[in-house]
Amino acid sequence: MLRRLEEFAGRDLYVTGCMPLVQMDEIRSVCNPRVIHPDEIQERSGSIGTRGPGATGVVQVASGCAGRCSYCITRLARGRLRSAPAEAVLDAVRGLLASGAYEIQVTGQDVAAWGLDRGESFPDLLRGISGIPGRFAVRVGMMHPASVTGILDDLVEAFHSEKVFRFLHLPVQSGSDTVLERMQRGYTAADVIRIVDAFREEFPDMMISSDFITGFPGETDEEFQETLELLRRCEFVKVNVTRYSRRPGTPAAALKDLPERLRKERSRALLAEANRIYDRYNERWMGRVTPVVATEKNVPGSTVCRNPCYLNVVIRDDLPPGFSGRALITGNHRHYVIGELV
């Protein structure tokens, strides 16, 4: 990111997000941007809800984090968990629906932790959102496995609403208990399996995505194999793989890095396995007819739609945002499938 900022050093730059809160000296060494504090964005807009492209709307239900991961700079930048009041969230959703949104994306650094600082729980908030009258669907954002374990049964129950996409983003980071301990993630591989099995038992076609970090300091070949095994066991779809890089001021920054070559090799191996799982997941939809809703435009002559499991279905037709119908799935392009209206 610093290299990218340096490339644009001669232009008017605005920098926001977590980075300027903890790396301002480094930023000033390569450019002289105007800085907008993340909280200032909401203050200026006056709402925690924002319209996205097409028929999407985004609601940030919380900022900060309740975790203490040894490698993460977000906690240092954003501070402890701060949950938005439930009524503010519901008002934001109502406003987005009134503006024409269909897909409501509920976001935060850890959505499952919402309410811990207020004596409330996220499943109750999710039920409140899905109880709002209207035609829409909620995409629940990233949830830390440690936060999910304490609300698992109630969370699964809340996902039974037809207004909630059968989609879960569970950032696992590693499948090795010893690496997870060094990361200070607060859960084990067995906890992850329990979460995945609980959801898949209720929703067999559920899309569960994840994030992994390869080459964390001290990661052995055996520990990396444990990560591959967890990926295969849980069949995560849409996996984001990141090579570990140290963040200043974090406990892990003091640990000795693995060679970059090894981090790259493990990243490629993990991504290759994830892509095979992605293809298998898409293949299970081939020849099936599924409900779809148009959420955003693609290139001219095609439209991006979502099915109840948040499958990315491209219809080769110009459809208005919010259009609903049924589609026969005919083609697999890994990151999306092709559908034909029936």
Regions found by a protein language model. Give the residues of each.
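Canonical Radical SAM [4Fe-4S] cluster-binding loop centered on the CxxxCxxC motif
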Residues: G54-E87
